[in-house]
A protein has these predicted regions:
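Conserved catalytic core of sirtuin-type NAD+-dependent deacylases
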Residues: 1-200
């Protein structure tokens, strides 16, 4: 299973070294962590990438794809695991609003570019200490790369202009139905969109 990190007990169970240092998921999923706790920050994401790679899209993805295929439809997801695209949903019909762990960008934002990186393993991971080493490198400046994910307290995420443009074009049309699946008040991005559509 792919953990949500909203259940603190489950999070601590997966990452005992982080419990010892009182590092919560929100601490590690931040630009601050990549500058101050780099071995732990990259360990957190490397573990998540390996976990996501081991998991396959469940039947719900196939059902959704078959249902949406004949419709003029779009998926707006806060998930960063890439499972919608892996399940066969067309790229031009998905908006990964919080980014994807399968893309990287420069930690120092030397350029407003991101690149796909599907390699697993991406860096060395010591699961006993939950420290990573041999980090991925920015293709441009050769500095450290980071996940192309909108993190907590993140003003440096560069977004995905193509996905954003596709979604803008879609929402300009009349929309008859919006379905929220697995939405949480803790991450209300999709809730806001649904409410906005409801008020049209």
């Amino acid at each position: 299973n792919i953990p949500t990190f909203r259940d603190k007990d489950g999070y601590w169970k997966n990452f005992p070294p982080f419990k010892d240092k009182n590092l919560e998921a929100q601490d590690l999923a931040s630009p601050w962590a990549f500058r101050n706790e780099l071995p732990h920050a990259w360990a957190f994401y490397e573990w998540r990438r390996r976990n996501a790679k081991e998991n396959q899209p469940h039947e719900g993805y196939s059902i959704t794809n078959k249902w949406l295929e004949p419709q003029d439809s779009f998926i707006h997801t806060t998930n960063t695991d890439g499972l919608h695209l892996r399940s066969g949903c067309p790229e031009d019909r998905v908006m990964e609003v919080h980014g994807s762990m399968w893309r990287l960008q420069c930690l120092n934002t030397c350029t407003h570019q991101f690149w796909e990186e599907l390699s697993v393993t991406l860096c060395n991971l010591n699961t006993d200490t939950m420290k990573a080493s041999n980090y991925p490198i920015c293709k441009n400046c050769k500095g450290i790369a980071r996940p192309h994910i909108l993190m907590f307290g993140d003003g440096e995420y560069i977004g995905h202009p193509e996905q954003e443009a596709n979604f803008r074009r879609f929402v300009e049309k009349p929309i008859d139905l919006a379905i929220l699946v697995g939405s949480s008040g803790a991450v209300p991005t999709n809730d806001y969109i649904a409410l906005n559509l409801q008020e049209r």
